[in-house]
Amino acid sequence: MTFTEQCNQIFNQVIRDYHITNDVDTPINNPYDRESINNRLYLKCWIDTVQWHLEDIIRDPHIDPVEALALKRRIDRSNQDRTDLVEQIDSYFRQKYSEVNILPDARINTESPAWAIDRLSILALKIYHMKEQAERRDASEEHREKCQNKLDVLLEQQVDLSMAIDQLLEDIETGHKYMKVYRQMKMYNDPSTNPILYGKK
C-alpha cells in the first residue's frame, strides 16, 4: 500500500465515522495509537470534517449573530489546530528522512508533504459531499448531472494528487528532493502581533 492509499483509506474512515452522528460536537474516537502517523492522519481529517460542517452552519442566513460570532471563533481555533497538526505531520517526515543523503542537484518542492496531504484530506471531503449532491433525489436531473461532472473531476484530481505526493515522498527518500519546512507564523491569533489584541488604536 502506498502512503496516499493509506491516507485516503483513513480519510474515508473518518468521514464515515463522523457521519454516523453528523454532529459537529461529536467527540472524536481515534482508533489509532497516539504515537503513530495514522493517529495524526485521522485527527487531521476529523478536524477538517468538523470544520467543513461548521462552515456550512455559519452560512445559514438566519443564524443568530451571537452564535455566528462564537462559530467564527471556533473556526479560527480549528484553523490553528489544523496548521499545528500539519506541522506535526511534516515533523514526522523530517525525522523519517533525516538520514537521507541529499544529492548535489536535489531540488526543493513548492510545498511540504504535509501541506499536500492537507489538500488530499479536504479533497476526500469534497468527493464525499459532491457524491451526495450527485445522488440527491430531491434535486433536479440538471443539478445531479452537473454535480456528477464535478465529481468526476474531483476523482481524477484525487488520483493525480495522490500520485504526485507519492512521487514527492519517493524523491525525498532517494535524495532527489529535500524538505525545508517554514512554519506558518500566523499573526491574527497571536496577541503580540494582532493590533486589536495588543491594543493598538
PLM segments and residue spans:
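Anionic, Ser/Thr-rich low-complexity intrinsically disordered regions
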Residues: 1-201
